[in-house]
Structure formats: C-alpha cells, structure tokens
C-alpha cells in the first residue's frame, strides 16, 4: 500500500471523489503544511495555523498509480486559482500536492507540465508541490462526510457535481 497527500479545496470533496476509485483502500481527511503541532478545524479555517485541508489516500499501486490519482485530482478542482475553490476562500483551500518521495515529486511536476503544455486550463496551474510535513487527521465528524451527509446543501451543490464528473470522465476507474 502506498500513500498520497493532496489538497484541492474542501477535503470533503476530495474524500468523496477518491473513495470511489478502484485501488483506493482508504481516504482520510486532514491537515498538512502548517506550523502548529495539533491543528483543529477552527484553527485551520481561521488561517492561523498555516495548514491546508488535504486528504491522505492509501492506495494499491498495482490497481491505480500515482499519476492516475493526479489526473483525477486535477479534474475535480480548479488548480489555477490561488487559495480558493469556488466560494471557499483562504490558504486552507490551496491546491497542493504534498509528495512523500522524489518519485512522487517528479511525477507531480511532469503531470503539471503536461497539463500546462496542453493548455487544459485557461490559466497556469498554481498548485503547490512540496515535501510532505506531518499529516494530521481531521476530527471524526469530517471523516466520510459526504457518505453521511449527502442531503446537506453543500454536498448537493458542490460535491455531487464533482462526483458526476468523475463518473463521466473516469468511469473505467470506479469501484463496482
């Protein structure tokens, strides 16, 4: 089992998206990249801790590789807006790849360069690519949020359309 740590706006969106993929065994919402030892949601949302909302993905590289995870990552959020995803604004919503080794770093740089060269987006990608500091799991009520709260407005208006996009574009990667 390998791990990936990605931030692309609200972690509820990424958790719901990656949980649907074949080869993904576990997705944990959490915080990464800040300067406090034990961040909580309030500190992260205030911007005071410097952390980014992220997901830690545990995956089987024999079933899905890191580059494919990144393709899905770039499809489900806007990597061209600095510290913002839709109405979610602040450094905690940064687009970020926290790599765990040099292979992940090189893969991330290669995928970004390819997407920029192909002009997939209307603006350059501003995703941070940084060595992963300590990952901090978020509070329990953030885990599996979409699965437990599908009728909430945020889930219906923000997360569900992203999941529909994944079903259309990456149907071959979905769990049965």
Swiss-Prot record:
The record's keywords, sorted A to Z, are: Oxidoreductase
Q: What class does this enzyme belong to in the EC scheme?
A: oxidoreductase
Q: What is its EC number?
A: 1.8.4.11
Which molecular-function annotations from GO does this UniProt entry contain? L-methionine:thioredoxin-disulfide S-oxidoreductase activity; peptide-methionine (S)-S-oxide reductase activity
Task: Please name the InterPro entries in this protein's record.
Answer: Met_Sox_Rdtase_MsrA_dom (IPR002569), Met_Sox_Rdtase_MsrA_sf (IPR036509)
- One BP annotation, GO: protein modification process
Active-site positions, per UniProt? 10
Any one Pfam family here would be PMSR
Name the chemical reaction catalysed here.
L-methionyl-[protein] + [thioredoxin]-disulfide + H2O = L-methionyl-(S)-S-oxide-[protein] + [thioredoxin]-dithiol; [thioredoxin]-disulfide + L-methionine + H2O = L-methionine (S)-S-oxide + [thioredoxin]-dithiol
Q: Which domain of life is it from?
A: Bacteria
The yes or no answer to whether the keyword Oxidoreductase is present is: yes
Q: Which family does it belong to?
A: Belongs to the MsrA Met sulfoxide reductase family.
Q: What does this protein do?
A: Has an important function as a repair enzyme for proteins that have been inactivated by oxidation. Catalyzes the reversible oxidation-reduction of methionine sulfoxide in proteins to methionine.
Q: What is this protein called?
A: Peptide methionine sulfoxide reductase MsrA
- The species this protein was found in: Chromobacterium violaceum (strain ATCC 12472 / DSM 30191 / JCM 1249 / CCUG 213 / NBRC 12614 / NCIMB 9131 / NCTC 9757 / MK)
Q: Which gene encodes it?
A: msrA
């Amino acid at each position: 089992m390998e791990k990936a740590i990605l931030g692309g706006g609200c972690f509820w969106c990424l958790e719901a998206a990656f949980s649907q993929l074949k080869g993904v065994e576990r997705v944990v919402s959490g915080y990464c990249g800040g300067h406090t030892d034990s961040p909580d949601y309030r500190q992260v949302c205030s911007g005071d801790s410097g952390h980014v909302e992220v997901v830690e993905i545990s995956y089987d590289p024999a079933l899905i590789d890191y580059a494919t995870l990144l393709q899905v990552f770039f499809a489900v959020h806007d990597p061209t807006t600095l510290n913002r995803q839709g109405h979610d604004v602040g450094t905690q919503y940064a687009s970020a790849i926290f790599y765990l080794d040099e292979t992940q770093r090189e893969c991330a740089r290669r995928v970004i360069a390819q997407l920029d060269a192909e002009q997939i987006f209307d603006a350059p990608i501003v995703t941070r690519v940084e060595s992963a500091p300590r990952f901090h799991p978020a509070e329990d009520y953030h885990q599996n949020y979409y699965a437990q709260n599908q009728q909430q407005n945020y889930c219906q208006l923000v997360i569900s359309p992203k999941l529909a996009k994944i079903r259309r574009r990456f149907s071959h990667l979905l769990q049965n």
